[in-house]
């Protein structure tokens, strides 16, 4: 499946194959040709400006913009051959960068194979059509004699240079003109050629202010985008279009009714899906369902059409080949009549993988590229990246974040303060912004209208106007209320065959990568076809964003923008002072508004002679004290941190509370922080109704079940709609407040530093030179203190935003939903009574009980189920895991305790032992009454509700069950962890983890005795089994409205539907004990036992699992720490049926087949352990370290224990090697005068989840001789063998799934005995 990226120079001659003269689709038949380059299969690069549908004047910079962020214009860009050559080479480099990462390669592979359907909604049913603009373009071929012929080619994607705006990349599907209307096959399932306008050299910049990270520093929050990620963003749009899934039917429309609201293009659902992250939640669930259903119906129509195709306008097209391609593309099945049909299970996987699998956010993580946290993150002017072809600036594996230049951590390579060599600011007439003018009258008016951006205005004594210009980016995006669907409030009719809606749309990029690695390569068909010789192609008209004037607003009072402007310092170094009067600062360019009284007093007094350094220190101390202010308010208990100076900093006031921000906040709540208060009332939610009844009992019960499921859907739909409104109308305002406060603190710091610099300039004390470094250190400290203040501000805004969501919007929604429940329950009860004669009295009582139970508890809104919108996803998972932990057993100083914060009490009985665990110590339980640990749960973590979700996780080590024990005790089920509550009627209720032979069992039982179980049956091959003496990580999630899921080592192993269970009245105690175990010699070890108050999702489980697997300590075969001076047997992971043997002392080692054991009756087999050579690891240089653990990166010597002696392993200088590369290792070699290279490094270079180790060998100059592995070869007259060698070859193959340099170190252990 490797993808080849072709390399070109623009001057390369046309070859009618990979370099052609293209007549693009919008020029087809007009004899207008462009030089085009086939960068890879079915993708072409045309190094020309995208001019289709434009006018020449569109390329010239306008005076202003109608809407949107800043734009950069240059009509001369990409007009010369040298420009085109640089563009072409840059695109080749970006494609190589994308291809070099498996996630990017998978994206390219899907695009290459997503061939547009040869036809569309308007083409003939029974015929493929290759002449349509949507699938082909013409080209002009020239033979050696100079004669030309016109041909045509089928393709998927054509990439041009940028259109009029250099920093505006766009993807357009081919538009067909049908019946005087525009028709888009890319939106109808068929797909079409996709055209991209792209510029790699001018990239957007953005802020990371709302990320709550400690590395954030004032002045260092701006980043520039990586053009590879910009290209992948557009390629995701291409993928959607090729599959006919490009979304056009829904947009988030910006409100523009107030002057502080951004003038922005409507944001399409297509754009939000492509960006990903939390912003995709702006698209409500009912809209997502509608889009899903539309594509499903489109594909059904295509399946029907494909079934009828029998011919093509081009007789050379292989119809059967294309049918197979489309069957695979659309994942169609065939019915018994050979007709293509949509398999809805396959369709759901396909749809989710295309629409939700690839996103900018997820690809950024895979490529280690910094990108915006939110689609609404603060954007700034674009910058130029002039040296993308310079590998020291940008390479095709790391991009800008080059580790060797110390630019990898914290994305320093993209940081505008750190990597200044990588970019150039753009300015001049080419840079155009959407500006808003705010003008305020000052004393008696004059005709003066001055732009005070540069602080050069001087007003006359007669007065005038103060006018400031504000960039559109500085305004707040707030969505119109009609951007959100009201479908969840509409009436719905339920019947026995009602189809439930999917409530979650997502797909893991990791799953796509796994599927890509497993799939076989598709054979692409011939891309040549017949040309169109005449035509009048249609190109849609370019919509210009140019404006000729700046929008001006007259205001009477100061706004936040006057407050921020009054805090800006002059650009030149001069004497300035600080003032607490905004108006004073606005009319006097040497005065800076500040809201820190002590700072104002200190800086204005100036340096006092030789006390200069102390004056600076005092300023820093005052700034620290005032900027770190925070408080709490009892009435707003869910906001833990309130920053009181935000009010005077941003002009946040309430009438009657001027100068008292805290008082105003206490009176009004967090709504005070909003400029625009959205409407939180919801339309009435129509009660569910039931279709005409059936007399069949099964259908009646199914109708009732569907009704209850639909009721659950309704709650979730309304919650998600409310969350979408919050994201689009409220959360953007709180995020903007954070940006505004960041800017304010930045201005405060800048003013203080300039005052210090000016005072230092005029300072003439004798210590002036000596204190220079200290002054700089103190100024840096000033930035650090502002950064800490910013963290408090982010917490304040984040929690205030959540508070408004939960206490205002969700509470209002719950009122409506409870009314909906009341009406719907009455309808359902009436339905049951009306049909009681068909279902019987007994069933009637059960159903009534079930309905009362369901409707008695509202479905909770859990914020933890929604991504935090203020921190990045990786940090968010850590936060979720920490906040949702309600029990966490830890062992410290040999005492077992709960460290979750809920302080459950723990009783440890005498025979509950402590042994080495996965990290630290673990609980070891043997089979007697006093080997027991009891956790008495805190009251806060009771689970006496049928809607409480939870997760149990722990590490488990169980000895291998021998064949004799399996025969004797194989039917004995015994619990190891239990929360079962015993009632007087002997009906247990709760949950338990138990073992039975080779099976692990999870049991849930409700108080009525209903039971659900998941049984994991271990592998018959005990060497690879989970429950055979290795440490394994067990996670069981329980979603009470869905299923219980059992994971082992992060992999789903079993599920059980649990929606039918009632309340689980579990015991107050959790008991860790071997209960009802018949084998007196049985034991288990348990480590890191935790309970979470939510059903963890797969990504959270993966993060939890890997968090325990530190690569600091290497591990033996069982998962215990690898130790020095301990005997181990070595097993190669890639050849696990082999052992290591030695030919002779001083000679080589090789692999032999290990003995095996098979028991057909019990279905057990495995390779026996403890055979072959024994190895011992010793420190390369003895030291006084107390612990005996081998750490990754330790330098070691490896010995073989042979005939009661220890013999060192190494490679003699100039020794034998296969191909002069694979150096043959020797044991006990000791030839006079020939040094033995024996220095090794124990490392973990790959596969964190496997308990394997790699060994790296060095020569006497510390040069690598390679990793220890095997080579199949022959030495002398010996037979062909797998011989142990050291080879550098392995370093180039570390990404391979199986590699011969991975080794298991197997110590003898009581938990494994060979049968």
Curated annotation (Swiss-Prot):
Q: Which domain of life is it from?
A: Bacteria
User: What biological process terms from GO does the record include?
Assistant: proteolysis; symbiont-mediated perturbation of host neurotransmitter secretion; symbiont-mediated suppression of host exocytosis
Query: Can you tell me which residues form the catalytic site?
Result: 234
Cofactor or coenzyme needed = Zn(2+)
Question: One GO CC annotation, please?
Answer: plasma membrane
Which cysteine pairs are joined by S-S bonds?
439-467, 1077-1093
An example of a GO molecular function for this protein is: metalloendopeptidase activity
Note on cofactor: Binds 1 zinc ion per subunit.
TM ranges: none
Enzyme Commission numbers on file: 3.4.24.68
The family database entries (CDD domains) matched by this protein are listed as: Toxin_R_bind_C_TeNT
Keywords attached to this entry: Disulfide bond, Hydrolase, Metal-binding, Metalloprotease, Neurotoxin, Plasmid, Protease, Toxin, Virulence, Zinc
The positions annotated for binding Zn(2+) are 233, 237
Q: Which InterPro entries match?
A: Bot/tetX_LC, Clostridium_toxin_transloc, ConA-like_dom_sf, Kunitz_inhibitor_STI-like_sf, Toxin_rcpt-bd_C, Toxin_rcpt-bd_N, Toxin_trans
Q: Which reaction does it catalyse?
A: Hydrolysis of 76-Gln-|-Phe-77 bond in synaptobrevin 2
Q: What else is known?
A: The C-terminus of the heavy chain binds to ganglioside receptors.
Task of the protein:
Tetanus toxin acts by inhibiting neurotransmitter release. It binds to peripheral neuronal synapses, is internalized and moves by retrograde transport up the axon into the spinal cord where it can move between postsynaptic and presynaptic neurons. It inhibits neurotransmitter release by acting as a zinc endopeptidase that catalyzes the hydrolysis of the '76-Gln-|-Phe-77' bond of synaptobrevin-2.
SUBUNIT field = The precursor polypeptide is subsequently cleaved to yield subchains L and H. These remain linked by a disulfide bridge and are non-toxic after separation.
- UniProt record similarity statement: Belongs to the peptidase M27 family.
- Name under which the protein is recorded: Tetanus toxin
Gene that encodes the chain: tetX
